[in-house]
Amino acid sequence: MKGPMMADGRGGPGSRLRDMTAKHERPQDTGKTIARIFSYWKEHWSWLVIMLVSSLCEVFCTLMAPILIGKAIDNCIDLSNMTVDFTKLNVIVIMLLMLYISSSWFSWVQQYGMTNVSLKIAKKIRTQMMDKMLEQDIHFYDVHTRGDLMSRFTNDVELMKSGLGDSFIQLFNTIFTLAGTVVAMVALSPSLTVVCCMSIPVVFMMTNIISKQTRKFFSSQQVSLGQLNGLVEESVSGIKMVRSFGIEQQQIDKFNSINEELRKSGVKAQIYSGLLMPLMRVLENIIYIIVAVLGGIMATSTDMTVFGIGIATITVGTIQSFLLYTKQFLRPINQVASQFNAVQSAIAGAERIFTILDTKPTITNKPDAVTLKEETVKGDIVFDHVSFGYEPGKLILKDISFTAKQDEVIAIVGTTGAGKTTIINLLTRFYDINSGSIKVDGIDIRDITKESLRDQMGIVLQVPFLFSDTVNYNVSYGWPAATQEEIINAS
Protein backbone atom coordinates (compact mmCIF):
# COMPACT_ATOMS: atom_id res chain seq x y z
CA MET A 1 0.00 0.00 0.00
CA LYS A 2 1.26 3.41 -0.86
CA GLY A 3 1.84 5.46 2.28
CA PRO A 4 1.48 9.20 2.79
CA MET A 5 4.52 11.42 2.98
CA MET A 6 6.64 11.59 6.10
CA ALA A 7 6.28 14.63 8.27
CA ASP A 8 9.42 16.33 9.50
CA GLY A 9 10.76 14.73 12.62
CA ARG A 10 11.96 16.86 15.46
CA GLY A 11 15.41 16.59 13.99
CA GLY A 12 14.23 17.36 10.46
CA PRO A 13 14.68 20.60 8.57
CA GLY A 14 11.78 22.20 10.44
CA SER A 15 11.38 25.92 10.11
CA ARG A 16 15.04 26.90 10.05
CA LEU A 17 15.01 26.88 6.25
CA ARG A 18 11.77 28.83 5.96
CA ASP A 19 13.37 32.16 6.72
CA MET A 20 14.97 31.81 3.30
CA THR A 21 11.57 32.33 1.64
CA ALA A 22 11.82 36.08 1.23
CA LYS A 23 15.34 35.74 -0.16
CA HIS A 24 14.05 33.51 -2.92
CA GLU A 25 11.83 36.24 -4.40
CA ARG A 26 13.06 36.66 -7.96
CA PRO A 27 14.00 40.11 -9.32
CA GLN A 28 11.09 42.02 -10.77
CA ASP A 29 10.74 42.18 -14.54
CA THR A 30 7.54 44.07 -15.16
CA GLY A 31 7.64 43.82 -18.96
CA LYS A 32 8.00 40.04 -19.02
CA THR A 33 5.42 39.65 -16.26
CA ILE A 34 2.81 41.66 -18.14
CA ALA A 35 3.55 39.79 -21.37
CA ARG A 36 3.19 36.49 -19.56
CA ILE A 37 -0.11 37.55 -17.98
CA PHE A 38 -1.59 38.31 -21.39
CA SER A 39 -0.21 35.10 -22.90
CA TYR A 40 -3.11 33.38 -21.12
CA TRP A 41 -5.43 35.19 -23.53
CA LYS A 42 -4.41 33.12 -26.57
CA GLU A 43 -7.10 30.50 -26.11
CA HIS A 44 -9.76 33.19 -25.57
CA TRP A 45 -9.11 35.11 -28.79
CA SER A 46 -12.81 35.07 -29.81
CA TRP A 47 -13.79 36.98 -26.67
CA LEU A 48 -10.88 39.30 -27.31
CA VAL A 49 -12.30 40.15 -30.74
CA ILE A 50 -15.78 40.69 -29.29
CA MET A 51 -14.41 43.05 -26.64
CA LEU A 52 -12.32 44.93 -29.20
CA VAL A 53 -15.36 45.49 -31.41
CA SER A 54 -17.49 46.46 -28.39
CA SER A 55 -14.82 48.87 -27.25
CA LEU A 56 -14.70 50.52 -30.68
CA CYS A 57 -18.48 50.84 -30.74
CA GLU A 58 -18.56 52.28 -27.22
CA VAL A 59 -15.87 54.82 -28.10
CA PHE A 60 -17.76 55.80 -31.27
CA CYS A 61 -20.94 56.44 -29.27
CA THR A 62 -18.99 58.40 -26.66
CA LEU A 63 -17.25 60.56 -29.27
CA MET A 64 -20.44 61.38 -31.15
CA ALA A 65 -22.19 62.83 -28.10
CA PRO A 66 -20.11 66.06 -27.81
CA ILE A 67 -20.56 66.74 -31.53
CA LEU A 68 -24.35 66.51 -31.18
CA ILE A 69 -24.28 68.75 -28.09
CA GLY A 70 -22.28 71.36 -30.02
CA LYS A 71 -24.71 71.13 -32.93
CA ALA A 72 -27.61 71.62 -30.53
CA ILE A 73 -26.09 74.86 -29.23
CA ASP A 74 -25.17 76.24 -32.65
CA ASN A 75 -28.24 75.09 -34.65
CA CYS A 76 -31.06 74.95 -32.10
CA ILE A 77 -30.38 78.09 -30.05
CA ASP A 78 -30.49 81.56 -31.59
CA LEU A 79 -28.40 83.69 -29.23
CA SER A 80 -29.35 86.95 -31.00
CA ASN A 81 -33.01 86.78 -29.99
CA MET A 82 -32.73 83.97 -27.37
CA THR A 83 -35.06 81.48 -29.10
CA VAL A 84 -34.88 77.68 -29.23
CA ASP A 85 -35.85 75.40 -32.12
CA PHE A 86 -37.38 72.55 -30.11
CA THR A 87 -38.08 70.44 -33.20
CA LYS A 88 -34.38 70.12 -34.00
CA LEU A 89 -33.49 69.94 -30.31
CA ASN A 90 -35.85 67.00 -29.69
CA VAL A 91 -34.27 65.05 -32.55
CA ILE A 92 -30.79 65.63 -31.13
CA VAL A 93 -31.94 64.68 -27.61
CA ILE A 94 -33.36 61.39 -28.92
CA MET A 95 -30.12 60.69 -30.79
CA LEU A 96 -28.12 61.44 -27.64
CA LEU A 97 -30.31 59.10 -25.62
CA MET A 98 -29.76 56.31 -28.15
CA LEU A 99 -26.00 56.93 -28.10
CA TYR A 100 -25.82 56.79 -24.29
CA ILE A 101 -27.90 53.59 -24.13
CA SER A 102 -25.77 51.97 -26.85
CA SER A 103 -22.57 53.04 -25.10
CA SER A 104 -23.74 51.48 -21.83
CA TRP A 105 -24.69 48.23 -23.57
CA PHE A 106 -21.32 47.90 -25.31
CA SER A 107 -19.62 48.64 -21.98
CA TRP A 108 -21.62 45.82 -20.36
CA VAL A 109 -20.56 43.41 -23.14
CA GLN A 110 -16.92 44.22 -22.41
CA GLN A 111 -17.39 43.79 -18.67
CA TYR A 112 -19.21 40.48 -19.12
CA GLY A 113 -16.53 39.13 -21.45
CA MET A 114 -13.70 40.29 -19.22
CA THR A 115 -15.27 38.80 -16.11
CA ASN A 116 -15.93 35.50 -17.88
CA VAL A 117 -12.42 35.22 -19.29
CA SER A 118 -10.57 36.45 -16.20
CA LEU A 119 -12.34 33.84 -14.06
CA LYS A 120 -11.36 31.11 -16.53
CA ILE A 121 -7.76 32.32 -16.52
CA ALA A 122 -7.74 32.41 -12.70
CA LYS A 123 -9.07 28.85 -12.67
CA LYS A 124 -6.30 27.74 -15.03
CA ILE A 125 -3.62 29.44 -12.94
CA ARG A 126 -4.91 27.83 -9.74
CA THR A 127 -4.85 24.44 -11.47
CA GLN A 128 -1.29 25.03 -12.68
CA MET A 129 -0.21 26.08 -9.20
CA MET A 130 -1.83 23.04 -7.61
CA ASP A 131 -0.16 20.71 -10.11
CA LYS A 132 3.17 22.44 -9.59
CA MET A 133 2.99 22.33 -5.79
CA LEU A 134 2.08 18.64 -5.76
CA GLU A 135 5.09 17.76 -7.92
CA GLN A 136 7.57 19.76 -5.84
CA ASP A 137 10.22 18.17 -3.64
CA ILE A 138 9.81 18.16 0.13
CA HIS A 139 12.67 20.67 0.26
CA PHE A 140 10.35 23.15 -1.47
CA TYR A 141 8.05 23.04 1.56
CA ASP A 142 11.02 23.44 3.89
CA VAL A 143 11.76 26.90 2.46
CA HIS A 144 8.13 28.02 1.97
CA THR A 145 5.68 28.24 4.83
CA ARG A 146 2.23 26.86 4.21
CA GLY A 147 0.76 30.27 4.92
CA ASP A 148 2.95 31.89 2.28
CA LEU A 149 1.93 29.28 -0.30
CA MET A 150 -1.74 29.72 0.59
CA SER A 151 -1.34 33.49 0.24
CA ARG A 152 0.03 33.04 -3.27
CA PHE A 153 -2.64 30.48 -4.10
CA THR A 154 -5.53 32.71 -3.01
CA ASN A 155 -4.63 36.39 -2.49
CA ASP A 156 -2.12 36.72 -5.33
CA VAL A 157 -4.33 34.90 -7.83
CA GLU A 158 -7.27 37.11 -6.87
CA LEU A 159 -5.17 40.26 -7.17
CA MET A 160 -3.94 39.12 -10.56
CA LYS A 161 -7.49 38.35 -11.72
CA SER A 162 -8.83 41.72 -10.57
CA GLY A 163 -5.95 43.69 -12.06
CA LEU A 164 -6.15 41.69 -15.28
CA GLY A 165 -9.86 42.39 -15.72
CA ASP A 166 -9.85 46.10 -14.93
CA SER A 167 -6.60 47.00 -16.67
CA PHE A 168 -7.32 45.03 -19.84
CA ILE A 169 -10.64 46.77 -20.49
CA GLN A 170 -9.06 50.08 -19.59
CA LEU A 171 -6.22 49.44 -22.05
CA PHE A 172 -8.62 49.05 -24.98
CA ASN A 173 -10.73 52.06 -24.06
CA THR A 174 -7.72 54.26 -23.36
CA ILE A 175 -6.13 53.61 -26.75
CA PHE A 176 -9.33 53.92 -28.76
CA THR A 177 -10.72 56.88 -26.79
CA LEU A 178 -7.48 58.84 -26.94
CA ALA A 179 -7.06 58.21 -30.66
CA GLY A 180 -10.68 59.09 -31.48
CA THR A 181 -10.72 62.12 -29.21
CA VAL A 182 -7.53 63.55 -30.70
CA VAL A 183 -8.94 63.16 -34.23
CA ALA A 184 -12.19 64.90 -33.21
CA MET A 185 -10.33 67.68 -31.38
CA VAL A 186 -8.04 68.33 -34.36
CA ALA A 187 -11.10 68.57 -36.60
CA LEU A 188 -12.66 71.16 -34.27
CA SER A 189 -9.58 73.24 -33.38
CA PRO A 190 -5.96 72.22 -34.08
CA SER A 191 -4.59 75.04 -31.91
CA LEU A 192 -6.56 74.01 -28.81
CA THR A 193 -5.61 70.38 -29.46
CA VAL A 194 -1.93 71.31 -29.18
CA VAL A 195 -2.63 72.82 -25.75
CA CYS A 196 -4.29 69.60 -24.55
CA CYS A 197 -1.56 67.35 -25.94
CA MET A 198 1.04 69.24 -23.91
CA SER A 199 -0.31 67.42 -20.84
CA ILE A 200 0.58 63.93 -22.15
CA PRO A 201 4.36 64.05 -21.39
CA VAL A 202 3.57 65.38 -17.92
CA VAL A 203 1.18 62.49 -17.26
CA PHE A 204 3.67 59.85 -18.38
CA MET A 205 6.46 61.45 -16.36
CA MET A 206 4.34 61.47 -13.18
CA THR A 207 3.20 57.88 -13.74
CA ASN A 208 6.75 56.64 -14.36
CA ILE A 209 8.20 58.33 -11.28
CA ILE A 210 5.43 57.15 -8.95
CA SER A 211 5.31 53.60 -10.36
CA LYS A 212 8.98 52.99 -9.63
CA GLN A 213 8.38 53.75 -5.97
CA THR A 214 5.08 51.95 -5.52
CA ARG A 215 5.98 48.67 -7.24
CA LYS A 216 8.55 47.69 -4.64
CA PHE A 217 6.16 48.56 -1.80
CA PHE A 218 3.31 46.48 -3.27
CA SER A 219 5.69 43.54 -3.70
CA SER A 220 6.92 43.93 -0.11
CA GLN A 221 3.30 44.08 1.05
CA GLN A 222 2.53 40.70 -0.55
CA VAL A 223 5.65 39.10 0.93
CA SER A 224 4.73 40.33 4.42
CA LEU A 225 1.17 39.07 3.97
CA GLY A 226 2.47 35.62 3.07
CA GLN A 227 4.76 35.59 6.12
CA LEU A 228 1.88 36.67 8.36
CA ASN A 229 -0.38 33.92 7.02
CA GLY A 230 2.40 31.40 7.56
CA LEU A 231 2.91 32.44 11.17
CA VAL A 232 -0.82 32.32 11.93
CA GLU A 233 -1.17 28.88 10.30
CA GLU A 234 1.80 27.48 12.24
CA SER A 235 0.65 29.02 15.53
CA VAL A 236 -2.83 27.51 15.18
CA SER A 237 -1.69 24.06 14.01
CA GLY A 238 1.04 23.97 16.67
CA ILE A 239 -1.03 25.47 19.51
CA LYS A 240 -0.28 22.52 21.82
CA MET A 241 3.45 23.06 21.38
CA VAL A 242 3.07 26.80 21.94
CA ARG A 243 1.09 26.21 25.14
CA SER A 244 3.41 23.44 26.36
CA PHE A 245 6.47 25.68 26.22
CA GLY A 246 4.62 28.79 27.35
CA ILE A 247 5.80 30.86 24.40
CA GLU A 248 2.51 32.60 23.65
CA GLN A 249 4.10 36.02 24.16
CA GLN A 250 6.96 35.10 21.84
CA GLN A 251 4.49 34.21 19.08
CA ILE A 252 2.52 37.41 19.74
CA ASP A 253 5.70 39.48 19.50
CA LYS A 254 6.67 37.79 16.25
CA PHE A 255 3.15 38.34 14.89
CA ASN A 256 3.20 42.01 15.89
CA SER A 257 6.57 42.48 14.19
CA ILE A 258 5.41 41.02 10.85
CA ASN A 259 2.05 42.76 11.17
CA GLU A 260 3.82 46.09 11.62
CA GLU A 261 5.97 45.45 8.53
CA LEU A 262 2.78 44.69 6.59
CA ARG A 263 1.24 47.94 7.82
CA LYS A 264 4.31 50.00 6.90
CA SER A 265 4.63 48.57 3.39
CA GLY A 266 0.87 48.93 2.86
CA VAL A 267 0.86 52.56 3.99
CA LYS A 268 3.83 53.42 1.77
CA ALA A 269 2.28 51.67 -1.22
CA GLN A 270 -1.07 53.43 -0.81
CA ILE A 271 0.46 56.85 -0.10
CA TYR A 272 2.76 56.81 -3.11
CA SER A 273 0.16 55.39 -5.49
CA GLY A 274 -2.47 57.73 -4.04
CA LEU A 275 -0.48 60.75 -5.20
CA LEU A 276 -1.32 60.06 -8.83
CA MET A 277 -5.07 60.70 -8.75
CA PRO A 278 -4.91 64.16 -7.08
CA LEU A 279 -2.10 65.22 -9.41
CA MET A 280 -4.11 64.04 -12.41
CA ARG A 281 -7.16 66.00 -11.28
CA VAL A 282 -5.11 69.16 -10.82
CA LEU A 283 -3.66 68.76 -14.30
CA GLU A 284 -7.11 68.06 -15.75
CA ASN A 285 -8.58 71.21 -14.21
CA ILE A 286 -5.65 73.36 -15.36
CA ILE A 287 -6.01 72.16 -18.95
CA TYR A 288 -9.79 72.64 -18.76
CA ILE A 289 -9.41 76.25 -17.58
CA ILE A 290 -6.80 77.04 -20.24
CA VAL A 291 -8.98 75.60 -23.01
CA ALA A 292 -12.06 77.47 -21.73
CA VAL A 293 -10.20 80.80 -21.62
CA LEU A 294 -8.55 80.36 -25.01
CA GLY A 295 -11.81 79.11 -26.51
CA GLY A 296 -13.66 82.15 -25.21
CA ILE A 297 -11.04 84.46 -26.68
CA MET A 298 -11.18 82.64 -30.02
CA ALA A 299 -14.98 82.83 -30.08
CA THR A 300 -15.06 86.59 -29.47
CA SER A 301 -12.01 87.61 -31.50
CA THR A 302 -12.30 88.13 -35.25
CA ASP A 303 -8.58 88.47 -35.95
CA MET A 304 -6.42 86.47 -33.55
CA THR A 305 -2.74 85.59 -34.14
CA VAL A 306 -0.13 83.70 -32.08
CA PHE A 307 3.54 84.18 -33.06
CA GLY A 308 2.36 85.62 -36.33
CA ILE A 309 0.14 82.63 -37.12
CA GLY A 310 -3.54 83.32 -37.67
CA ILE A 311 -5.96 81.43 -35.41
CA ALA A 312 -9.41 80.62 -36.79
CA THR A 313 -12.41 81.74 -34.77
CA ILE A 314 -14.80 79.12 -33.42
CA THR A 315 -18.46 79.03 -32.39
CA VAL A 316 -19.88 78.68 -28.89
CA GLY A 317 -21.10 75.18 -29.76
CA THR A 318 -17.61 74.20 -30.89
CA ILE A 319 -16.18 75.45 -27.59
CA GLN A 320 -18.70 73.34 -25.68
CA SER A 321 -17.89 70.27 -27.79
CA PHE A 322 -14.16 70.85 -27.33
CA LEU A 323 -14.50 71.25 -23.56
CA LEU A 324 -16.34 67.92 -23.42
CA TYR A 325 -13.59 66.35 -25.52
CA THR A 326 -11.04 67.83 -23.13
CA LYS A 327 -12.66 65.87 -20.31
CA GLN A 328 -12.77 62.77 -22.51
CA PHE A 329 -9.15 63.32 -23.48
CA LEU A 330 -7.93 63.31 -19.89
CA ARG A 331 -10.50 60.86 -18.51
CA PRO A 332 -8.91 57.68 -19.97
CA ILE A 333 -5.55 58.59 -18.49
CA ASN A 334 -7.34 59.55 -15.28
CA GLN A 335 -9.07 56.17 -15.20
CA VAL A 336 -5.76 54.39 -15.68
CA ALA A 337 -4.47 56.34 -12.71
CA SER A 338 -7.47 55.26 -10.63
CA GLN A 339 -6.67 51.61 -11.43
CA PHE A 340 -3.00 52.14 -10.66
CA ASN A 341 -3.12 50.39 -7.28
CA ALA A 342 -4.84 47.31 -8.71
CA VAL A 343 -2.38 47.08 -11.59
CA GLN A 344 0.64 47.37 -9.31
CA SER A 345 -0.77 44.75 -6.93
CA ALA A 346 -1.58 42.45 -9.86
CA ILE A 347 1.98 42.66 -11.19
CA ALA A 348 3.47 42.00 -7.75
CA GLY A 349 1.09 39.07 -7.20
CA ALA A 350 1.76 37.67 -10.68
CA GLU A 351 5.51 37.69 -10.07
CA ARG A 352 5.03 35.68 -6.88
CA ILE A 353 2.76 33.24 -8.75
CA PHE A 354 5.20 32.81 -11.62
CA THR A 355 8.02 32.21 -9.13
CA ILE A 356 6.14 29.10 -8.00
CA LEU A 357 5.23 28.02 -11.54
CA ASP A 358 8.86 28.40 -12.65
CA THR A 359 10.26 26.36 -9.76
CA LYS A 360 11.32 22.96 -11.05
CA PRO A 361 11.68 19.91 -8.79
CA THR A 362 15.28 18.80 -8.36
CA ILE A 363 14.39 15.16 -7.68
CA THR A 364 13.20 13.69 -10.96
CA ASN A 365 13.06 10.29 -12.62
CA LYS A 366 15.85 9.33 -14.98
CA PRO A 367 14.74 8.62 -18.57
CA ASP A 368 15.74 4.96 -18.14
CA ALA A 369 14.51 4.58 -14.54
CA VAL A 370 13.12 1.14 -13.70
CA THR A 371 9.72 0.46 -12.16
CA LEU A 372 9.46 -1.69 -9.04
CA LYS A 373 6.68 -4.24 -9.15
CA GLU A 374 5.02 -5.61 -6.04
CA GLU A 375 5.28 -9.25 -7.14
CA THR A 376 9.07 -9.06 -7.66
CA VAL A 377 10.18 -6.80 -4.81
CA LYS A 378 12.02 -8.53 -1.95
CA GLY A 379 12.78 -5.51 0.22
CA ASP A 380 16.53 -5.73 0.88
CA ILE A 381 17.77 -2.23 1.79
CA VAL A 382 21.40 -1.10 1.83
CA PHE A 383 22.76 2.28 2.97
CA ASP A 384 26.32 2.48 1.65
CA HIS A 385 28.50 5.30 3.06
CA VAL A 386 25.61 7.77 2.96
CA SER A 387 26.15 11.43 3.86
CA PHE A 388 23.43 14.07 3.80
CA GLY A 389 22.58 17.56 5.04
CA TYR A 390 19.47 19.70 4.68
CA GLU A 391 21.62 22.79 4.30
CA PRO A 392 24.88 23.12 2.34
CA GLY A 393 27.91 22.42 4.52
CA LYS A 394 25.85 21.10 7.47
CA LEU A 395 25.70 17.30 7.40
CA ILE A 396 23.07 15.48 9.45
CA LEU A 397 24.31 12.01 8.44
CA LYS A 398 28.00 11.29 7.90
CA ASP A 399 29.21 8.11 6.18
CA ILE A 400 26.28 5.96 7.37
CA SER A 401 26.23 2.30 6.30
CA PHE A 402 23.82 -0.49 7.27
CA THR A 403 21.79 -3.32 5.72
CA ALA A 404 18.17 -4.27 6.36
CA LYS A 405 17.31 -7.61 4.78
CA GLN A 406 13.94 -8.94 3.72
CA ASP A 407 11.59 -9.77 6.63
CA GLU A 408 13.94 -8.24 9.21
CA VAL A 409 12.53 -5.86 11.82
CA ILE A 410 14.86 -2.93 12.35
CA ALA A 411 14.59 -0.27 15.05
CA ILE A 412 16.51 2.97 14.64
CA VAL A 413 17.01 4.76 17.95
CA GLY A 414 18.80 7.95 18.84
CA THR A 415 18.52 11.34 20.45
CA THR A 416 16.48 14.17 18.98
CA GLY A 417 18.20 15.42 15.86
CA ALA A 418 20.27 12.27 15.38
CA GLY A 419 18.76 11.65 11.93
CA LYS A 420 16.12 8.96 12.44
CA THR A 421 13.45 10.73 10.40
CA THR A 422 16.09 11.79 7.91
CA ILE A 423 16.93 8.15 7.14
CA ILE A 424 13.30 7.45 6.25
CA ASN A 425 13.11 10.65 4.20
CA LEU A 426 16.15 9.51 2.22
CA LEU A 427 14.84 5.97 1.77
CA THR A 428 11.61 7.30 0.26
CA ARG A 429 13.73 9.71 -1.78
CA PHE A 430 12.08 12.82 -0.47
CA TYR A 431 15.62 14.18 -0.57
CA ASP A 432 18.68 13.11 -2.58
CA ILE A 433 21.81 12.18 -0.67
CA ASN A 434 25.04 14.18 -0.87
CA SER A 435 27.25 11.13 -1.30
CA GLY A 436 27.13 7.33 -1.12
CA SER A 437 24.20 5.23 -2.29
CA ILE A 438 20.92 3.72 -1.10
CA LYS A 439 19.84 0.49 -2.77
CA VAL A 440 16.65 -1.55 -2.78
CA ASP A 441 17.17 -5.13 -3.98
CA GLY A 442 20.56 -4.07 -5.32
CA ILE A 443 19.18 -1.16 -7.38
CA ASP A 444 20.16 2.41 -6.56
CA ILE A 445 16.94 4.24 -5.67
CA ARG A 446 18.00 7.06 -8.01
CA ASP A 447 17.59 4.53 -10.84
CA ILE A 448 14.04 3.67 -9.71
CA THR A 449 10.95 5.76 -10.48
CA LYS A 450 9.87 7.71 -7.41
CA GLU A 451 6.27 6.60 -7.76
CA SER A 452 6.99 2.86 -7.85
CA LEU A 453 9.54 3.15 -5.01
CA ARG A 454 7.01 4.79 -2.69
CA ASP A 455 4.24 2.45 -3.82
CA GLN A 456 6.11 -0.41 -2.16
CA MET A 457 6.34 1.32 1.22
CA GLY A 458 3.84 1.70 4.02
CA ILE A 459 4.57 4.64 6.30
CA VAL A 460 3.05 5.55 9.65
CA LEU A 461 3.51 9.23 10.41
CA GLN A 462 4.86 10.46 13.73
CA VAL A 463 1.87 12.80 13.92
CA PRO A 464 -1.13 11.33 12.04
CA PHE A 465 -2.79 13.72 9.63
CA LEU A 466 -6.51 13.50 8.92
CA PHE A 467 -8.09 14.98 5.82
CA SER A 468 -11.44 16.72 6.16
CA ASP A 469 -13.35 13.73 4.83
CA THR A 470 -14.81 10.40 5.94
CA VAL A 471 -13.01 7.76 7.99
CA ASN A 472 -13.13 5.47 4.95
CA TYR A 473 -11.39 8.11 2.85
CA ASN A 474 -8.60 8.57 5.39
CA VAL A 475 -8.00 4.85 5.94
CA SER A 476 -7.88 4.12 2.21
CA TYR A 477 -6.03 7.31 1.26
CA GLY A 478 -2.92 5.48 0.05
CA TRP A 479 -4.98 2.75 -1.63
CA PRO A 480 -8.09 4.22 -3.31
CA ALA A 481 -9.04 0.83 -4.81
CA ALA A 482 -9.40 -0.82 -1.38
CA THR A 483 -12.65 -2.67 -0.74
CA GLN A 484 -14.85 -2.01 2.29
CA GLU A 485 -13.70 -5.29 3.85
CA GLU A 486 -10.04 -4.33 3.40
CA ILE A 487 -10.71 -0.92 4.93
CA ILE A 488 -12.37 -2.52 7.98
CA ASN A 489 -9.50 -5.00 8.39
CA ALA A 490 -6.94 -2.22 8.14
CA SER A 491 -8.79 -0.26 10.80
Label every model-predicted segment.
Residues 358, 365-368, 372-491:
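ABC-type nucleotide-binding domain
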Residues 64-66, 70, 169-211, 267-320:
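A hydrophobic transmembrane-helix motif
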Residues 48-106, 186-191, 293, 300-313:
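Transmembrane helix-loop-helix hairpins at lipid-water interfaces of multipass membrane proteins
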